[in-house]
Amino acid sequence: MRKQLSVGITFGLIFLSIAVTAVVTVLAMQHKTNDVLGDLPEKMARYEMLDEVDSIISEHYYGSNDQKVLRHAVANGYVCGLNDGFSRLLTSEEYAQYLAVNRGQMQGVGLSYHKTDSGSLKVDTVSGGSPAAKAGIKKGDEIVAVDAIVLDLSNCDEIAQKLENPSVLSVSLTFRHKGQETTVDLEKGYEAASVSSESYQNIGYIRISEFYDSTASQVQETVDLFLASGVRALILDVRDNASTNIENAISTLDVFVPLNQEAPAATLLNKAGETVTAFSTSAGEVNLPMAVLVSKGTQSAGELFACDLRDFGKAQLVGQKTAGNALVGQSFRLSDGDSLLLSVGVMMPYKSDSFNQAGLLPDVEAELNEKTEKITKDSQFLAAASLFTE
């Protein structure tokens, strides 16, 4: 037979529960209040100068101002004060472009250039796979007219904006190559090529400039072709690769290394040192001698890729000490539609200690004697190739 509590005891327990809850709530609120009050002087000092500047501008500034622009500038200045290369504030349009570029989706025609003394545009680089490349424009060519308007010193800067303006979807270019002028119509937008390759004395060379969504599949296709041709070694070039896309870097790494068994292939740690994400590799691998070319400009996902290849025992590093940037970024959407990019953690490689600020020391140090597009004149490439010819 179940015993029932009396009404008095029941109400007493209810009141006791309410009292305990109230005490706990008060203590929690007091703790939170103490934290807030403790931060109050710092917060007041933080905004005191801004309030003072705002007051002076409101009273004395002769011109007009756009409050939204001012708010964005203030927030952007705050972020810039972090002195962090990744962290920044982007408008909604800038953020959309940032995402597209990270995926390898470019908006322009694939040219970089500089203005000549006559007002024409001298082509410095042509992106592989771009509309300009497909139209036959080469490095060193001159753009002499845009949309049938001949370029000169008086109009060059204004007319050239048509090449950069994302709202202009197509453009007609007249370019001069070895004295001959050609006019082409170009549609803007293309998927950037991040992988190029060639052979040297039965050694396969693969240049990886970025880690885009399509990079891993491009690398896999290139490796398959090299394996079918019977190359005896591979040289992977990630010099100046400063990509921040870790997931794509691990997907590309997966082409070369086996299943990670001792630890995650890469681990992302937050501010508290807690694991946020752990990346793995699959069972496939390449069983050839390999070297990785690195430089002072190799950083972030480029460094992780190189470090992991060495940690897996698959490759030696050749070149210069790398940049030492292992910070991980995250985007935060703000209430006005802007986005905040912020460094929120650090990436850890397969076995090595963190390379953040320390960089990666190459197994074989080699300086680049000159900037060249020919690997046969590339001193760092030749230093790597010598590992497989001795």
Language model segments and positions:
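STAS-typified acidic loop motif
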Residues: 199-215
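A short, well-ordered alpha-helical element
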Residues: 212-232
